[in-house]
Amino acid sequence: MADLFSTVQEKVAGKDVKIVFPEGLDERILEAVSKLAGNKVLNPIVIGNENEIQAKAKELNLTLGGVKIYDPHTYEGMEDLVQAFVERRKGKATEEQARKALLDENYFGTMLVYKGLADGLVSGAAHSTADTVRPALQIIKTKEGVKKTSGVFIMARGEEQYVFADCAINIAPDSQDLAEIAIESANTAKMFDIEPRVAMLSFSTKGSAKSDETEKVADAVKIAKEKAPELTLDGEFQFDAAFVPSVAEKKAPDSEIKGDANVFVFPSLEAGNIGYKIAQRLGNFEAVGPILQGLNMPVNDLSRGCNAEDVYNLALITAAQAL
């Protein structure tokens, strides 16, 4: 796991990447940003009252040299953000509503990213996923050609690294959604120097069972191959046929995956969430994420049970997405 983050840190160091942290009074956030700034890995921006944040840092024996602190209540560029917010929401928010919304740290931080004053955002240590993701969907929005954002985990154990998706966002993706998730997950894998070999998972392998659910995955494979013919991608697979070469030889002998997949696309959020937690708890894999993909600019959501190391690592990932 250290190798993964060492590689990412080398990639982002010296690139002058600015990451905003809306939860400026959270101890874990402050510990992480102090270390990020001290290591000169990236340039942290913390949101909140400067006096309160500095007092909290002093209480924790942390130095915040190199850390910018922006307070929505006193920020000089607020009017520009208000106008940009109103324009971006296209009739869904008045100036008064925009000013009120931008006093919320997550909306304020997201607007900094949208306006190019920061390159990415990390939140969620003290907020729900909805509080973190909603401003991003309203303001930053998804990339052209991408209808929905999705969430992946990098599953790492020693030298092994796999991508699991979607384990965080889309409850019941349809065929189009699954194809999109597969392509975006392959792009995320490349960001971590993982050459993607994508398996679309089901309880059937290449038509061994027939149902609406298996047909959904089979259709997703066709759509993904049409949209990204250069990708090594196939399905539908049971997990063993995607992961174990000897099983693949029996169940899917003609597939280009050959039991050597490293990007696994689950057919539903239910399956994906259960799958990554089984790998984490029974297989002793470290689960890094969820990493949100498909947005125009990177926004990532921490678990409220995170520690300072989790914050540090997700900030590195967010910075890498911004490059």
Swiss-Prot record:
Q: Extract one GO BP annotation from the record.
A: acetyl-CoA biosynthetic process
Q: State the compartments where it is located.
A: Cytoplasm
InterPro entries, A to Z: P_Ac_Bu_trans, P_AcTrfase, P_AcTrfase_dom1, P_AcTrfase_dom2, Phos_Acetyltrans/Butyryltrans, PTA_PTB
According to the UniProt entry, what is the EC number of this protein?
A: 2.3.1.8
**NCBIfam families the UniProt entry points to:** PRK09653.1, pta
- UniProt xrefs under Gene3D superfamilies: 3.40.50.10950, Isocitrate/Isopropylmalate dehydrogenase-like (3.40.50.10750)
The UniProt similarity line reads: Belongs to the phosphate acetyltransferase and butyryltransferase family.
Q: What's the short name of a Pfam family annotated to this entry?
A: PTA_PTB
Could you tell me which pathway this protein works in? Metabolic intermediate biosynthesis; acetyl-CoA biosynthesis; acetyl-CoA from acetate: step 2/2
Q: Name one GO cellular component term.
A: cytoplasm
Q: Which UniProt keywords apply?
A: Acyltransferase, Cytoplasm, Transferase
- Does Disulfide bond show up as a keyword for this record? no
Source superkingdom:
Bacteria
So what does this thing catalyse? acetyl-CoA + phosphate = acetyl phosphate + CoA
Q: What is this protein called?
A: Phosphate acetyltransferase
Molecular function GO terms recorded: phosphate acetyltransferase activity
